């Protein structure tokens, strides 16, 4: 399979020079389901914003679906190739009705009304929202329903890749189960950033672990998430369903002294803590 996402030696810093990403390199192939994990401040959201063309890399190379995101033209073009679901759905559900929200993206692509209508109908069906929802006011929907509308809006673009930032953050257990079922029914490539490691294990086959802007592990989800020593070193915990499935945690080791971790990929360094 060819690579849909190519990230090479990516770096980014927020003013006045605080590094958010440091020498990050990875590739995603068509159809992969990948989880992005790490403690708060690891750089996960920054990485998603760069992949979405909303931030410009400070150094390195980034290409998504053939679009060179190191150029202004590439960052404009990539919006036709991907769908993004933000952590706070109120940041992207802004129209008067559910139908208007889901139709917003396809209309901006310049599609004829008939094609937009077909995409809206298909996207709502894929997230389990019937015709009765089309005229609903998004402000009055539950958190789970808003999440579905946001995903439908992304799917209406018919993206090659779907980026989701903390998709379970405001969902109850039932909402998380329903979201998992929706994602299981999608064939689109997806990158999911989440602190809910159980959800990542349930929905992803591969995991990238970021800490202090560095890629510290990249490998099969069950291997990365079940490694108690790795999780402990980066301030994370093994998901309950995997407890005891991997190596037990040793006594806590200072992160600055931790060796590079490998799950099929070589890493030059682990984060150094201030």
In which residue ranges do the predicted regions lie?
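Helix-to-loop junction immediately C-terminal to a conserved catalytic motif
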Residues: 52
């Amino acid at each position: 399979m060819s690579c849909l996402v190519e990230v090479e030696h990516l770096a980014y810093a927020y003013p006045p020079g605080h590094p958010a990403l440091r020498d990050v390199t990875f590739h995603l192939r068509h159809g992969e389901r990948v989880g992005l994990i790490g403690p708060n401040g690891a750089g996960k959201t920054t990485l998603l914003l760069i992949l979405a063309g909303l931030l410009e890399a400070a150094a390195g190379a980034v290409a998504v679906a053939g679009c060179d995101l190191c150029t202004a033209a590439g960052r404009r073009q990539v919006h036709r190739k991907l769908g993004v679901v933000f952590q706070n759905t109120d940041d992207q559900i802004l129209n008067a009705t559910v139908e208007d929200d889901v139709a917003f993206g396809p209309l901006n692509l310049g599609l004829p009304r008939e094609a937009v209508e077909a995409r809206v109908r298909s996207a709502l069906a894929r997230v389990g929202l019937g015709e009765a929802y089309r005229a609903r006011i998004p402000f009055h929907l539950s958190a789970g329903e808003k999440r579905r509308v946001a995903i439908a809006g992304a799917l209406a673009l018919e993206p090659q890749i779907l980026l989701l930032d903390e998709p379970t953050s405001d969902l109850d257990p039932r909402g998380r189960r329903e979201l998992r079922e929706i994602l299981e029914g999608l064939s689109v490539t997806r990158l999911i950033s989440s602190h809910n490691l159980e959800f990542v294990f349930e929905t992803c086959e591969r995991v990238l672990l970021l800490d202090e802007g560095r890629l510290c592990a990249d490998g099969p989800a069950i291997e990365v998430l079940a490694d108690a020593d790795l999780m402990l070193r980066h301030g994370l915990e093994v998901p309950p369903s995997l407890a005891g499935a991997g190596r037990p945690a040793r006594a806590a080791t200072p992160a600055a002294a931790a060796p590079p971790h490998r799950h099929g990929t070589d890493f030059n360094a682990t984060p150094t803590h201030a």
